[in-house]
Design a protein with these regions (language model features):
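Acidic-enriched, low-complexity/disordered segments with a strong bias for Aspartate over Glutamate
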Residues: 13, 19, 29, 68, ...
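Short amphipathic alpha-helical segments
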Residues: 18-46, 80-88
Length: 108
């Protein structure tokens, strides 16, 4: 089983492909500044992905894995600040889904 006990999967919908690609470029420039903070707070993994199975939708998915609820809570202030900055730069709709890991099978 994974070390992660709590997972958050968020999606961000952008108005255009250009806005989405610009966000990805900006994240590449910003992530070295931001990622050490949640890592120190107990975040185990952060993954960015392009959702490809929704035609006409410009959506990114973000997977956050935390070692426990305390780590998740510590990191929320950090991610809220990042999200606030992202929304100030361009319009985006963010939807979050949180879950507790019940079963985790690895095949690698």
């Amino acid at each position: 089983m994974s070390e992660a006990k709590l997972i958050n999967y968020s999606t961000a919908d952008f108005g255009s492909k250009g806005d989405m690609e610009l966000r990805l470029l900006k994240w590449q420039d910003q992530k070295e500044e931001y990622l050490p903070m949640p890592e120190a707070g107990g975040m185990l993994r952060f993954t960015t992905m392009r959702v490809w199975n929704k035609e006409g939708v410009f959506r990114l998915g973000y997977l956050f894995e935390y070692k426990d609820e305390e780590s998740y809570k510590k990191c929320q202030l950090i991610w809220q600040e990042i999200e606030k900055n992202m929304k100030a730069e361009m319009p985006v709709k963010v939807f979050a889904n949180r879950g507790i890991v019940l079963d985790d099978s690895k095949f690698y």
